[in-house]
Amino acid sequence: MKKKVGIISLGCPKNLVDSEIMLGLLKKNDFEITSDSEEANVIIVNTCGFIESAKEESINTILEMANYKNKNCEMLIVAGCLAQRYKDEIIKEMPEVDAVVGVSGYDEIAKVIEEFYSKKNDKNDKEKAVFHKDTLSVEYLNNERLLSTNSGYAYLKISEGCDNRCTYCAIPYIRGPYRSRKMEDIISEAEFLAGKGVKEVILVAQDVTVYGKDLYGQKKLVELVREVSGIEGIEWIRLLYTYPEEIDEELIKEIANNEKVVKYLDIPIQHASDKILKLMGRRSTSEGIRNILDRLRAEVPDIVLRTSLIVGFPGEDEKDFKILYDFVRKYEFDRLGVFTYSREEGTPAYDLKPQIKKSVKESRRNDIMQLQKEIVQRKNESRLEKVYKTLVEGVSEDGIFYYGRTYAEAPDIDGSVYFTSAEPLKFGEFVNVKVLNIDDYDLIGEVINESSK
């Protein structure tokens, strides 16, 4: 009898791509895929593990899935970043877990399951399967994926790892150095996605702006974008994530002039105080960040800018926080996320002093998020009565509205557009929506036949 396998994918879009690759490999090896954990014989939790809250979510999910061992679940696998970072602890402290698969072991997932079942009746073999290949290959990304995003968009991972050495971040230790995929492999995957009806391709990496530097000796993102934009069927190309110090004039011009590149950038800035940026090991300066933001706004009309910030980094005093707060107030980001600093063992910032009290970190986060809420309110009001090309993604739970996204919203992290239509709509298609109302971070509108922005 075919074994039913379910995957719970936690964390970032890059992790989702890895989950989709595992799904594709499992399907290829004749496993049955299920989204219902209750009926799964094998449950895989693809974990995130780079900050405390992500680790907690991963551990809680593993324990929750372990409860299904009282039902149909015969095998529980922990994969991904937490598995890579804490394999010994998982093996020792979580007896419910049957196998641990690190970030370089995704392409072995079918083998992991098959070996478990072949040894299941061997009373003498109690050892857990641990798959941690010491490889820097990105070839696993060339395996055919089983898409979990079924409404017109898909992520396309163009590299793995990171060469930045931010003092707070564990990702280079978990995922290894930056490794670009071959351009022809990425183009081939983009063509595959277009053939599946994908209209929006989201190029994703820890830092897309340095794509190609390690492989070709120079940055190749603009060339890659041009190649992808030539693929029939792809209408939107979105870039996640772009480091400010690597955004150059060539890239700005491409974003401004290429109609398929959505005018949206997610630029992780983290702070605006030069003192804190230096302590963080960031390559940017406050002046450099401001210059690139000014250039983007001047050269790319209607560009939507998202950023992420860290408050409560060791040594951040009231003066540093005021610099950050005033920076957010001045630059009025369209989208913004704020993390409180997470003290991660094995990172240089772990031993920095003084560490900031949790209550102070939370207070600073709340202050910036309140400011951002006011900024978003004003920006959303400016979108009233305008018409936007919108990707239809689904129907609301009450069945009254369709929902989707304009160029100004990335999946999962930004708001949505809720809208009515006189005619039935297909998911994964584009319509023109006139914005009539706002609801906090979301927009409300109706489908019309006018041309869109």
Curated annotation (Swiss-Prot):
SUPFAM superfamilies, per database record: Radical SAM enzymes
Gene Ontology BP terms: tRNA modification
Keyword Membrane attached: no
Principal location listed in the UniProt entry: cytoplasm
MTTase N-terminal domain mapped to chain residues: 3-118
Keywords, sorted A to Z: 4Fe-4S, Cytoplasm, Iron, Iron-sulfur, Metal-binding, S-adenosyl-L-methionine, Transferase
Pfam families found in the cross-reference section: Radical_SAM, TRAM_2, UPF0004
Cofactor annotation comment: Binds 2 [4Fe-4S] clusters. One cluster is coordinated with 3 cysteines and an exchangeable S-adenosyl-L-methionine.
UniProt-annotated binding residues for [4Fe-4S] cluster 2: C162, C166, C169
Enzyme Commission numbers on file: 2.8.4.4
Compartments where located: Cytoplasm
Signal peptide as annotated in the record: none
A single GO molecular function term of this UniProt record: 4 iron, 4 sulfur cluster binding
Cofactor(s) annotated in UniProt: [4Fe-4S] cluster
GO cellular component terms, A-Z: cytosol
Family matches, as Gene3D superfamilies: Methylthiotransferase, N-terminal domain, Nucleic acid-binding proteins, tm_1862 like domain
Domain Radical SAM core residue range list: 148-378
Top EC group: transferase
Record function comment: Catalyzes the methylthiolation of an aspartic acid residue of ribosomal protein uS12.
Name of this protein: Ribosomal protein uS12 methylthiotransferase RimO
Organism: Acetivibrio thermocellus (strain ATCC 27405 / DSM 1237 / JCM 9322 / NBRC 103400 / NCIMB 10682 / NRRL B-4536 / VPI 7372) (Clostridium thermocellum)
